[in-house]
A protein has these predicted regions:
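Short loop/turn motifs that connect adjacent beta-strands in outer-membrane beta-barrel proteins
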Residues: 40, 150, 185-188, 201, ...
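Short acidic/polar hinge/loop motifs at secondary-structure boundaries
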Residues: 128-162
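Gram-negative outer-membrane beta-barrel transporters
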Residues: 567, 675-815
């Protein structure tokens, strides 16, 4: 008896429509071989979302989408992020290296089903868990990095359970499951070469992949490797933002807080010059208010130094083997390793948030008294200083599967590790202050030395440093260092389950699955010694983290084929975290009913439980965000320091889905599902903007320069909390129609998701209707109401082509008002509307091997993404676009040659 995994008939329709794609030139041969395989192997069939075997005509009671390798190729996907970004059910994923909202995770990618968070979707590889990345997002969420999962050439298909699956898979499957399944029993060799070129800057991408497999009488070995090299795209190559959106009040030249008798501390623009050195004067009082001086700030354009696309190199390897023994036991093992390196652009130096004092005796001080410096060590005229990430992932998984007279069993072990290092340069607080006092330099002893004498030098923060009094590299090096965060995430999973028939019903045998699982997740984050002492002026620092979490689980599933038309699925899972978190029991009920041969109904309801992670309870981090200061009435680039919270409670949720499938005639299908997720005690990072809005003069939460009540905001202190609730609902619609004509086969497809509700209860912002909003001022994510993909595919013999039109609806930006001004105290005429966005992709491929009758297969593919080079809708914020929704790259053209031996 053989064991295999396949997609259901319903999911097969979704496979093409989900990505608005259909078959390429060589798809018919794949179709034929799949049909033959189905005829041979029908005894045991599994689909993602179930642990019991299914009959050949089974239709999943849960909404299940399957994207096969043909569909993946048809959109020109170079990596997994290219696939998930086109999914209409994916909202708010972090797949762009945006330094302002994704500070330390450049080079990674993730999935965010339904906008419920990148940690709420369980990502599997061949039905087994993968380790989460050791470096969390800005929101403190550790996620599975899909960039490190497996070479694209090894993927056979991606299966998505869209209604939540915690009752079967555990707490991480709150929003659903995405299961990447590799090719099995591959025999042969394949090499692919990809080249992609962007319309802006020097943004290019080269990918080389190889696949090899060999089969014997009882087993198979397969190996895959991929290498990716991507050049960067800087904001200066394609400026989408307005100048003021990427301008900081802390520049160099900078400003100085001077105590004015009877007035208090006022910011004074560098008297030696601002605009002359590339700065932008921002006057806060009319010229002449203070004779000879200008009240205000010297703005600095930091945006041009940052990158939309990081410079990246990736190596990903995967090896699998399976062997079938004579006693119907099959052994499988797989090993994967990934090495990712990324470098994203950064400003010459960060703002200095500690208000250091320039003494009255400083040789360049024109004020005659001590003043507080409000700026940065290096600004205009200097090169950018990038941040670097290094991510190394290792995964080993092995299992034994056995077949019995009435079912099968499986035992498995998985071990996966992610080592992640993030490095970013910053200024040291004490050393910078010493340099302003004249004790700068690594050889200077501030106890025995004299200011500005011998090895002791002054650092000159004034604009005379650009001309008559430049700074030496010796003094600059003495107060600059790199913050190094070395993190490690470790996952171990032991699992065993069995599935067997229990009794016969009208539609076949009822089947029962029972299983147990033990998993342990360890996380350690080692900050460098300087960070442990909070030595940096902007990124500050944090203590080290070292913690673990282990979970015992037992689960069961009962499949009841009541009759030929009615199937019922009952599932329940018990998980015990121990300690303060405790345990949970989460059930699921799912039903499918075939009313007629053409029309079927389905529905499901389930509960979920997500425990606080090690990082959320014990961790902490400092991130960089652009915030709107209601006191100053201006935007500011601010350090947000978040501390862990050991008092967090687990979050709980209930999800339900109802839908139907309608096939009025052959090759035409309509799928519609209504879904709803409702959370209580949602674990979130406090929204920094909401903290600032609710307590702008709270000195414990809001740190300001100069006057602690009215000075410019420098730092926000927040934590992780349990929000009151979140409820989101919507409709998924999929349709596909295959037409056979004399000119070839044409297949139009439509896939859409409409969000009807995204209601939030924010601890600071209160109740929010978040559907159709950016949700900048609350805990939510950007939620355009409608995403839609429209496609048309054509195939004729050795030729194939497809065109996709992708639409994202407009939505409100609650950070800005309709007139483009910042939302300080409310917008009388409503929020600024982010325009809807339409892009067109196209692809053509030809089977050169068939054309020239060669023994090998040579498939040439050419295509374009965003063919008309549409700019992403403008957003009045850092970088000028919404990195959670839109792609900043513009038109991308690509070519691929695939050779199979």
């Amino acid at each position: 008896m053989k064991f295999n995994t396949r997609k259901t008939a319903v999911a097969a329709f979704v496979s093409s429509a989900l990505l608005c794609s259909t078959f390429s030139a060589f798809a018919q041969e794949a179709e034929d071989s799949q049909e033959e395989a189905k005829k041979r192997d029908v005894e045991l069939i599994l689909v993602t979302g179930s642990f019991v075997r299914r009959s050949e005509n089974f239709e999943s009671p849960s909404p299940l989408a399957v994207v096969d390798s043909v569909a993946i190729d048809s959109i020109g996907a170079k990596n997994i992020a290219d696939i998930t970004q086109t999914l209409t059910i994916n909202t708010g994923a972090e797949n762009n290296p945006d330094a302002f909202t994704q500070n330390a995770t450049a080079g990674t990618s993730n999935i965010n089903l339904r906008g419920l968070g990148v940690a709420s979707t369980l990502v599997l590889l061949n039905n087994k868990r993968q380790v989460v990345t050791a470096q969390p997002t800005n929101q403190g969420l550790n996620f599975v990095d899909t960039s490190s999962l497996v070479p694209m050439i090894a993927i056979d298909r991606m299966e998505v359970v869209k209604d939540g699956a915690s009752a079967l898979y555990g707490s991480d499957a709150v929003a659903g499951v995405v299961n990447f399944i590799t090719k099995r029993n591959y025999d042969g060799a394949m090499v692919t070469v990809d080249y992609q070129d962007g319309a802006h800057g020097d943004n290019k991408e080269y990918i080389l992949q190889g696949l090899w497999g060999a089969s014997g009488d009882n087993g198979n070995v397969m190996a895959a490797i991929s290498y990716t090299n991507r050049s960067p795209l800087f904001l200066s190559d394609r400026r989408l933002s307005r100048p003021q959106d990427d301008t900081s009040a802390l520049g160099n030249p900078g400003s100085y807080f001077l105590n004015i008798p009877g007035v208090g501390a006022l910011p004074i623009i560098d008297p030696y010059g601002c605009e002359e050195q590339g700065g932008t004067p921002d006057l806060r009082a009319p010229s002449g208010t203070i004779p000879g001086l200008e009240v205000g700030f010297c703005g600095f354009d930091f945006g041009k130094f940052y990158s939309y696309v990081a410079e990246e190199s990736r190596i990903n390897t995967y090896v699998s083997a399976n062997y079938e023994f004579d006693n119907d036991i099959t052994w499988t093992a797989e090993i994967g390793m990934a090495r990712n390196r990324a470098e994203r652009g950064g400003a010459p130096s960060f703002p200095i948030l500690t208000s250091p004092i320039v003494p009255d005796y400083h040789p360049q001080n024109p004020f005659g008294t001590g003043v507080a410096f409000f700026g940065r060590a290096e600004g205009n005229g200097f090169d950018g200083d990038p941040a670097n990430t290094e991510s190394d992932t290792f995964r080993f998984s092995t299992n034994l599967q056995g077949v019995t007279d009435s079912g099968f069993w499986e035992v498995s072990y998985t071990r996966a590790v992610n080592d992640f290092m993030f490095q970013v340069p910053d200024v040291l607080n004490t050393e910078f202050q010493l340099a302003l006092l004249g004790f700068g330099g690594s050889d200077c002893n501030p106890v025995t030395g004299s200011p500005g004498t011998g090895p002791c030098e002054f650092f000159n923060p004034f604009s005379t440093s650009y001309s008559s009094a430049p700074n030496s590299q010796y003094v600059v090096d003495s107060f600059t260092a790199k913050q190094v965060i070395d993190s490690k995430s470790d996952l171990e999973v032991f699992e065993a389950f069995t599935s067997f028939d229990v009794f016969e019903m009208g539609g076949g045998f009822a089947a029962l699955a029972l299983g147990v699982q033990y998993r342990e997740q360890q996380l350690s984050i080692d900050y460098d010694p300087l960070s442990n002492q909070d030595s940096f002026t902007f990124v500050i620092g944090n203590p080290d983290i070292d913690g673990s979490q282990d979970v015992w689980a037992a689960f069961g599933e009962l499949a009841l084929p009541i009759n030929d038309d009615l199937d019922v699925q009952l599932a329940v899972r018990y998980e015990d975290y121990g300690g303060a978190i405790g345990s949970t029991v989460d059930p699921k009920l799912a039903v499918s009913y075939r009313a007629t041969d053409e029309f079927s109904l389905r529905g499901s309801i389930s509960t979920s439980f997500r425990a606080p992670t090690v990082f959320l309870a014990e961790g902490g981090a400092t991130t960089l965000q652009q915030l709107l200061d209601p006191v100053q009435g201006a935007v500011a680039f601010v350090a947000v320091r978040t501390s862990g919270n050991e008092d967090l409670k687990p979050e709980e949720s209930t999800a339900y889905n109802v839908g139907f499938s309608y096939e009025p005639f052959r090759d035409f299908s309509i799928e519609l599902d209504y879904w709803n997720f409702e959370f209580e005690d949602l674990i979130i990072q406090e929204n920094a903007q909401a903290v600032l809005n609710s307590g702008p003069t709270d000195p414990d939460r809001v740190i300001r320069a100069g006057d602690p009540l009215t000075g410019p905001v420098l730092q926000i202190n927040n934590t992780y909390v349990n929000a009151s609730s979140l409820e989101t609902s919507g409709v998924d619609f999929v349709t596909s129609y295959k037409m056979e004509t004399e000119l070839g086969n044409f297949t139009p497809t439509l896939n859409a998701t409409y969000i009807t509700k995204y209601d939030l209860s924010d601890p600071q912002a209160g109740s929010i209707d978040g559907a159709g909003r950016r949700n900048f001022n609350n805990i939510g994510t950007s939620s355009p109401e409608l995403r839609m993909n429209l496609g048309l595919a054509w195939r004729n013999d050795i030729h194939a082509a497809n065109v996709f039109v992708r639409y994202i609806s407009s939505y409100d930006d609650d950070q800005n008002c309709a007139d483009g001004t910042a939302n300080v105290t409310g917008c009388a005429n409503g929020f600024y509307e982010v325009d809807n966005h339409v892009t067109v992709d196209a692809q053509y491929n030809i089977d050169l091997g068939a054309m020239f009758d060669t023994q090998q297969s040579y498939v040439l593919t050419v295509g374009g993404i965003n063919l008309f080079d549409r700019d992403p809708p403008r957003l009045f914020t850092n970088s000028g676009f919404d990195s959670k929704v839109h792609d900043p790259r513009g038109r991308q053209v690509y070519a691929r040659l695939a050779v199979e031996f």
